[in-house]
């Protein structure tokens, strides 16, 4: 069979920040290593748990801020410098802070739009070498959060109530606890 893509894809409407019930106070989720465990806001996986911060109302739109605050366990730095895995310019390399790793964050049950990607806390050299590969337009269900990066996303919680998971899509991180429930 012959198949051709349409000349123009169907338009989509992004969610407006002004439609969020928490536009001025987004929920904050920090992804980091703490006490040798991959955590979200200091918590690890509990199969039937969702904290107040992880509880949303049906038929609402919210903004969440996802923060990759790096390692925490071994101090500052990063993979590329300041004592990080690759060492600094004058340091000769080393294993420093291997815990500052990218986290591809996947949120089940919803799709979202990316409102803002704050890279001000990232190493500028690293960001400038990778920024062309990021696609922030359209609907997403997973977003890559680099070390030092903050991302604001907006999503609508509709159709279903229940417990749904959100997690880092690095299997080792997910298996070590970087997965949580949110409740609608």
Model-derived regions: residue spans:
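Short strand-edge motifs at loop-to-beta-strand transitions and within beta-strands
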Residues: 141-143, 149-155
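Beta-strand-rich interaction surfaces with strong enrichment in secreted/lumenal proteins
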Residues: 51-54, 140-144
């Amino acid at each position: 069979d012959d198949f051709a893509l349409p000349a123009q894809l169907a338009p989509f409407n992004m969610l407006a920040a002004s439609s969020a019930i928490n536009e001025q106070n987004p929920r904050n989720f920090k992804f980091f290593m703490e006490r040798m465990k991959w955590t979200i806001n200091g918590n690890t996986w509990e199969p039937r748990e969702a904290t107040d911060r992880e509880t949303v109302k049906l038929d609402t739109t919210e903004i969440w801020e996802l923060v990759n605050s790096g390692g925490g366990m071994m101090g500052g730095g990063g993979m590329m410098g300041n004592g990080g895995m690759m060492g600094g310019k004058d340091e000769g390399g080393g294993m420093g802070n291997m815990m500052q790793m990218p986290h591809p964050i996947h949120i089940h049950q919803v799709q979202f739009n990316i409102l803002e990607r704050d890279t001000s806390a990232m190493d500028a050299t690293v960001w400038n070498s990778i920024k062309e590969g990021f696609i922030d337009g359209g609907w997403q269900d997973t977003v890559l959060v680099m070390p030092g990066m903050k991302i604001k996303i907006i999503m609508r919680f509709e159709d279903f109530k229940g417990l749904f998971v959100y997690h880092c899509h690095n299997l080792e991180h997910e298996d070590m606890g970087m997965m949580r429930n949110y409740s609608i």
